[in-house]
């Protein structure tokens, strides 16, 4: 028997590291060694790939990739609909890190918060979305898929040939996800485009509007979601902006968390966190508006009386508030038929599909990641039937839900359309998974230039000996000050963990607790007009009618302990938590910017 060779501790450590990497199936490059949380592991050599195995043309990063262990028992691939973005080069990441350390933050004017859709998407340019190429029933499935792959590669080539990577925003490079959109549009009678009211221009691609209303001849309903996170005057201003530029739109205001009008909703107010109990989903604002829009579109071709009766039952149940537990609520409500679509259902059906077949209207829900598509379906159903998460890309395949026997909802995975938006704004819009960001500091700087983060969070400059003295801030200083305030330290050297602090600040922004709201063009000059508009007062009253009046709702002062922060950083599903959270304003600080301070009620020793 050969003699055993010595095996050092260093070799054993290396062996365990390699084993962990193989087990996790890390397809992406690891974080840069300069990250405070990534330790000494070097990032792997960048891999290039495309969504369907065609010739390698661009650097692709697959987000939230799971270990490759083959197909599941039902042939399900968990990585099939993962987000695929163009990878940032190492040079670009390092350049942005240097800028975060060197560039002094300068507050921007209110006019700089105004976004015009013409500047974001440039309608008529190559910033389109991929269309399904022509096909016939004589083609085999393999021929059709090969044709779609070639067409998709040509689509990517046109975009990357017209714009540089630095100018382009993140957008979806996964053909499988675009196929989901094609199928949803083909099977839908009415299309809902869900947007976030804080930045609806970001989530509204004009190319999709032209395709749905023009080529397909379908009705498009624009849902301005999360209206509780923006001042009512701004909501009304955005509604009129889209009506003016896109007259064929049907616009609906929606939120799953309507606010109590007894508390102020002005920007700059302090937030408390409240937990929705019992029939929380039945308090959604907007189902009645959506029903009226669908009635105007179908003009009597579909019997929607059962939907109206359901809304009346939900409103009555929410007003009584006689159910205290979520389990009782789910047992008490009628069953919802859920159909998970398979590959056979993804086969093309042709543009000549019969509308309102068998007296059923199919409503397709499309939009960007993290705009609240799944929450909207939960709000329409009246209870939780769809898993929701703060992490974009959570919906991995589309399912259909029968709201009533004559109304079918279809949930599509989120899609990012190509645009010219700054990538920092996309991160703040929740489009890019925060846990996967290689360089979060410039996004924090983008936020701090538009809302007074340092004042709202009572941050002290890291180099300031005198708290009353003025010091120039850079993005790195903001992150370091927040790490010092929260006690975020690295494991070995106990330095301020600026990477974790930056992620924490970005999560506060995405969750709406540091709310950055963009404005339509001309809003700054006409702000007083919109605040006194009749629809603004009507919106405030409508939120009051569905607000917390007698239902079980608990409010707790937000202290954001380290343990609570860790739960947020793990991106747990709302299903696992068993209850939803919303932020409730409690006082107005008079700030002119749409930012809320959840820490103003805390003393120095409590932070």
Curated annotation (Swiss-Prot):
Q: Which UniProt keywords apply?
A: GTP-binding, Nucleotide-binding, Phosphoprotein
**Heme in keyword set:** no
Q: Report the residue ranges that make up the CP-type G domain in this protein.
A: 178-418
Q: Name one Pfam family in it.
A: MMR_HSR1
Residue ranges with Basic and acidic residues bias: 15-26
- Source domain of life is Eukaryota
What the entry lists under CDD domains is as follows: HSR1_MMR1 (cd01857)
Entry-linked InterPro entries: G_CP_dom (IPR030378), GNL1-like (IPR043358), GTP-bd (IPR006073), P-loop_NTPase (IPR027417)
Where are the residues of the annotated region Disordered? Answer: 1-81, 544-607
The UniProt record lists the keyword Nucleotide-binding: yes
Q: What is one GO biological process annotated to this record?
A: DNA damage response
The molecular function terms of the Gene Ontology recorded here are: GTP binding; GTPase activity
Binding of GTP: at which residues? 225-228, 367-374, 411-415
Modified-residue entries (Phosphoserine), positions: 32-34, 51, 68, 324, 561-563
User: Per the record, where are the segments of Acidic residues compositional bias?
Assistant: 550-585
- Phosphothreonine found at: 48, 50
Enumerate the PROSITE patterns for this protein. G_CP
Q: Where is the composition biased (Basic residues)?
A: 1-14
What's the family? Belongs to the TRAFAC class YlqF/YawG GTPase family.
Comment, domains: In contrast to other GTP-binding proteins, this family is characterized by a circular permutation of the GTPase motifs described by a G4-G1-G3 pattern.
Q: What role does this protein play?
A: Possible regulatory or functional link with the histocompatibility cluster.
Q: In its UniProt entry, what is this protein called?
A: Guanine nucleotide-binding protein-like 1
Protein species of origin: Rattus norvegicus
Q: What is the lineage of its organism?
A: Eukaryota, Metazoa, Chordata, Craniata, Vertebrata
Q: Its encoding gene is what?
A: Gnl1
